[in-house]
C-alpha cells in the first residue's frame, strides 16, 4: 500500500492473519526514498492521492527530513495496528508482536525501529 497507510480493509486483513491464521509477527515496513512521504512533505496533491498524503502528514507533523518522516510514518502505522482491540487480545493471549522496520533501497539492509 502506498505510504504504509492503513484503512479498515488492511486492518481487517491484519486482524484475520493474527487471530485466525496465527501469524506470530506483524512487520510494518517502510522504505527509504518513499515517493508518498516525499509528496506529503513537498506537495499538496489533488485527487485520491490526497487521502494518502493527508494521513502521512498527520503522522509526520512538521518533520521535513525524508528518512525521519518515513520512520515516523511507520511508527504511526504500528501504533494504529496496536490500537486494535483484536490485535491487543492476540498480543496478550498468543504473544503476537507488531514491529516497525525500514528497508534501505540503496543497499538492501533493513533496520528495525
PLM ranges: what are they?
Residues 31:
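Histidine-centered divalent metal-coordination motifs
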Residues 28:
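Conserved functional hotspot residues or short segments at active or partner-binding sites
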Residues 3-23, 36-113:
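Divalent-metal-activated hydrolytic enzyme cores
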